[in-house]
Design a protein with these regions (language model features):
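A short, conserved alpha-helix within the catalytic core of class I
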Residues: 195-207
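A conserved beta-strand element that flanks and buttresses the S-adenosyl-L-methionine
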Residues: 187
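Conserved helix-to-beta-strand junction in the class I
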Residues: 207-214
Length: 314
């Protein structure tokens, strides 16, 4: 994809979130089942995925017993083909691996970087999943309204950075642009599908790995909506309309413009990932991180998102 088309798609998506922040946020309150599995794979706590699946988490609320780490200042692997089928954990550690993170209540605050944080619901999930944990949360998003509305009650332990992530990837500045100290965990959920181009998606994953300390973890989700016949059919229909409206050329394979609640002129760019693309993305950080797990979760089928969990090498 040429840079001009990529920028136009990013601008369409940014406009969508600015104009639909409230309605979008109202549909993004619950935790995803895959998040609990990610914590299990990081060995942060046992049985989280089962708790999420059973609905025992508190949707959209924060835990009253969460300790506060104090106000934060803003300026402050294994090859995927060796991992077996989705849902299997790869074998033992490779040379250069370090001990995995195991959270303990006596530790310093658990430092978490959430890139494309949206309304901050992953923080609320962590507060429920790790009761009593002090969490230092570094939130990055281009839609300030969406983030600030969701994180308003957590000002003491949240540092928010407004950043146009997609365009930072296009101009090659993403690693310099993210403002956060080395963290224990970096996540990016529900956003990789908004990034045009495989090279830019790989660049974001490398930036996430670079942001964590040795032994820290990275977890990302990759939307595979083409696996749903209903979603795939809608994507084809809305993309055809949007291309005419915006005068766009033919898009790359797997690229679509999705509508929103039957609203006029409300589109966002989305890429649906093939299994091969998931494997290719994992390979992009082979030298920097080991693949801890690859699995599928979420949606009506329990398989609309593909997750990758990594541990940074020493």
């Amino acid at each position: 994809m040429d840079a001009e088309t990529a920028r136009k798609l990013c601008d369409i998506t940014s406009t969508f979130y600015r104009e639909n922040a409230s309605s979008f946020s109202s549909t993004r309150r619950a935790s995803w089942a895959g998040w609990g599995r990610c914590l299990d794979e990081m060995e942060l706590c046992a049985g989280t995925s089962a708790a999420v699946s059973s609905g025992s988490h508190l949707e959209g609320s924060r835990h009253e017993g969460v300790a506060r780490p104090g106000k934060l200042e803003r300026d402050a692997g294994e090859r995927p083909e060796d991992a077996g089928s989705c849902g299997e954990r790869p074998g033992g550690p490779l040379p250069g691996d370090v001990a995995p993170l195991a959270w303990q209540p006596s530790r310093e605050p658990l430092r978490v970087l959430d890139v494309a944080c949206g309304n901050g619901r992953f923080l609320r999930f962590l507060q429920e999943a790790l009761p009593g944990a002090a969490i230092a949360y570094f939130a990055v998003d281009d839609c300030e309204q969406l983030a600030r509305d969701g994180l308003a009650g957590d000002a003491d332990n949240v540092a928010f950075q407004k950043l146009d992530i997609a365009n930072s990837l296009i101009n090659g500045s993403i690693e310099r642009a993210i403002e956060a100290p080395p963290v224990d965990m970096a996540v990016c959920f529900g956003f990789f599908h908004h990034i045009p181009g495989a090279d830019s998606r790989a660049a974001l994953l490398r930036a996430l790995v670079k942001s964590v300390r040795p032994g820290g973890h990275v977890a990302v989700s990759l939307w595979q909506f083409a696996k749903s016949p209903e979603l795939a059919a809608k994507a084809v229909e809305t993309t055809a309309k949007a291309r005419v409206e915006y005068g766009l050329p033919a898009l790359d394979e797997g690229d679509y413009l999705l509508g929103w609640q039957n609203r006029q002129h409300a589109y966002r760019y989305c890429h649906t990932f093939s299994d091969g693309e998931v494997a290719d993305l994992a390979r992009a950080v082979d030298r920097q991180a080991s693949l801890v797990a690859r699995f599928e979760a979420d949606g009506r089928t329990g398989a609309l998102n593909s997750y990758l969990v990594f541990r940074r090498r020493a």
